[in-house]
Amino acid sequence: MSGTTRIAYSGEPGAFAEDALIAFFGAEAERLAVGSFADVRAALLDGRAQFGVLPIENLVNGTVRETLDLVRDGALEIVGESVVPVNLVLAALPGVGLDDITRVYSHAQALAQSEPFLRTRTWQLLSTYNTAGAGAAIRDRNERDAAAVLSPRAATLHGLVELASGIEKDPGNRTRFWVLRSTASAAEISARSGAPRTTLLVGVRNEPGTLLAVLQLIAAAGVNMSKLESRPSQGGDWEYVFWMDLDAGANDAALQGAMKELAAVTSELRILGSYPRGAAL
């Protein structure tokens, strides 16, 4: 990868999004930390970054719908995915003990994922935009009666000391991130191994049996669907588009045949990306 290639992610250093970035591009990758998911999209479209990472799915909390909406218009292309484990610790400034804590900061999902542990105390639980940012805020404000729920790496980066580890209620929890680029970009990534996956956006007319017809065509082609998600179409009241992950590459003959037939029964049909599936760390 060229040394001038920059990858955008949402959050502070140590965020799970940065973990996903490092897992995909390597620890030496040049990074651009931005404040929100929408800022990642903006950085790709204005050229400040050539690639970006956004979370799309968590095993416990499900689909990240904001990400779906940000790639809805086709301005971004999915070129890869990265899957990272969600390991959580409780950390505070050096010298702070469990009995000193009155409040705990973290992203709402991280608080929910560690709730059984957190509810063993009478701490006030306060939601922040991201996990690593919670740790940075405690450090910057020198809060000696507060702790953060975040990853072990984020705790270390922000000068915090672990008070409890493995506090997530599901030790197998993982988050899947999309690796994205602008569809107008010529930026390339190195070849990756992994089973193929293609993500489609499908719109159907508001008529009986239209979604069923789509599913039957995909099944008849022998292509497995691993994910199906609906979102408002933004084009009419109570009308929806569907996001589909298919276990086939865009050049797969079976999928190409299905796409030709799908065009006849859909109001909108677009490939948002075809890429190798990411392996869990």
Label each PLM-derived region with a short phrase:
Residues 1-281:
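Domain-level signature for soluble enzymes in the chorismate/prephenate branch of the shikimate pathway
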